[in-house]
C-alpha cells in the first residue's frame, strides 16, 4: 500500500490515496482483531512456553494479555505513519510519537512510585496500550486535517464486523481451552511446554476457523482482499 499511496500522493490523487489507506486499515484490522483475541485467550499457554513455575506463568500471561489490548491501535498507527511518509511528511509522526513516549515515560515513573511490585509490569503494559491508543487518535486527527475525513470508506463498519465475528470465535476458543483442562495449576494446558503448544494450536485453529467462517458468511470484502494478496504472493513464489 505504501508504494501506491506514494504514487497517488505525488499525482495529487487523494481519493485513490484515501482508498488505499482505508483498505490497508481494514485489512490490518481484520488480522489484528483476531490476533488480539487469540493472544488474550492463549496468554497463559503462551507464557508457559517461556516460564516454568505456575506463578511465573500467571504473571507473564497477565502481561501478554495487557499488551494485546493495544494491538489494534498500534496497527492503525503503523498504517497512518506510512500515510504520512507517503505524503513526504516525517515531522508529524515525530510529533505524535514524541507525545506517546512522553505519556509512557511520565506514566511509568508514576506507576513505579505507586504500584505494588506484583502489578507493576502489568500496569506498565496497560499504560503502553493506553499511550499507543492516544497516539493513534492524535495521528488520525492530524491526518484528517491533512487529507480530510475518511467518512464513507467503511473503516468503522468493517471494524464493527470484525468485532462481531471475533466474539463467537473468542467464546469457541474459551470452550476449547476449558475442554482441554483450563488454565489452573497442573492442568493439561499448562502441564508442560509441549502440551501448551498443542493446546495453543487447537484453540487457535478453532478460533481461526470460526472467525474466517463468519467473515465468509458476512461476505467480507477485506477477506477477499487478503485472499487475493496471499494468492498473488504464493503465485509469484511458485513460478
Predicted segment positions?
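Membrane-embedded alpha-helical bundles of multi-pass transporters/translocases
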Residues: 1-239
Amino acid at each position: 500500500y505504501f508504494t501506491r499511496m506514494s504514487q497517488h500522493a505525488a499525482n495529487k490523487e487523494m481519493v485513490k490515496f484515501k482508498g488505499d489507506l482505508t483498505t490497508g486499515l481494514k485489512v490490518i484490522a481484520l488480522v489484528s482483531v483476531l490476533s488480539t483475541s487469540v493472544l488474550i485467550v492463549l496468554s497463559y499457554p503462551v507464557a508457559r512456553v517461556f516460564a516454568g513455575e505456575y506463578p511465573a506463568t500467571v504473571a507473564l500471561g497477565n502481561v501478554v494479555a495487557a499488551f494485546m489490548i493495544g494491538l489494534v491501535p498500534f496497527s492503525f498507527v503503523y498504517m497512518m505513519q506510512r500515510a504520512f511518509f507517503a505524503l513526504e511528511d516525517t515531522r508529524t509522526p515525530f510529533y505524535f510519537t514524541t507525545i506517546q513516549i512522553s505519556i509512557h515515560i511520565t506514566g511509568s515513573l508514576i506507576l513505579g512510585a505507586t504500584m505494588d511490585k506484583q502489578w507493576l509490569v502489568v500496569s506498565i503494559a496497560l499504560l503502553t496500550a493506553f499511550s499507543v491508543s492516544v497516539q493513534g487518535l492524535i495521528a488520525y486527527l492530524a491526518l484528517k486535517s491533512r487529507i480530510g475525513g475518511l467518512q464513507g470508506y467503511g473503516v468503522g463498519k468493517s471494524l464493527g464486523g470484525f468485532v462481531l465475528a471475533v466474539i463467537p470465535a473468542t467464546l469457541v476458543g474459551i470452550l476449547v481451552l476449558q475442554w482441554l483442562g483450563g488454565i489452573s495449576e497442573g492442568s493439561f494446558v499448562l502441564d508442560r511446554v509441549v502440551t501448551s503448544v498443542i493446546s495453543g494450536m487447537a484453540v487457535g485453529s478453532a478460533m481461526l476457523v470460526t472467525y474466517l467462517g463468519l467473515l465468509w458468511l458476512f461476505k467480507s470484502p477485506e477477506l477477499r482482499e487478503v485472499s487475493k494478496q496471499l494468492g498473488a504472493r504464493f503465485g509469484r513464489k511458485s513460478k
